[in-house]
């Protein structure tokens, strides 16, 4: 199955006006489990805590 390369960007740092952290990952193109944007809790080194990262388009 083909996979897409996606970028996850921190949502909390953007709201606070600090540098955003970004992660690169892959996802299945035709996944029925995650039809919308992917969201994961990842570590943000600028905020020094785990934050919500959302898929960019």
Curated annotation (Swiss-Prot):
It comes from the Bacteria. InterPro entries: Ribosomal_bL33, Ribosomal_bL33_sf, Ribosomal_zn-bd. One of its GO terms (biological process) is translation. Keywords: Ribonucleoprotein, Ribosomal protein. The keyword Ribonucleoprotein applies. Disulfide bonds: none annotated. GO terms for molecular function: structural constituent of ribosome. GO terms for cellular component: cytoplasm; ribonucleoprotein complex; ribosome. Pfam families: Ribosomal_L33 (PF00471). NCBIfam families: PRK00595.1, rpmG_bact. Belongs to the bacterial ribosomal protein bL33 family. This is Large ribosomal subunit protein bL33. It comes from Akkermansia muciniphila (strain ATCC BAA-835 / DSM 22959 / JCM 33894 / BCRC 81048 / CCUG 64013 / CIP 107961 / Muc). The gene is rpmG.
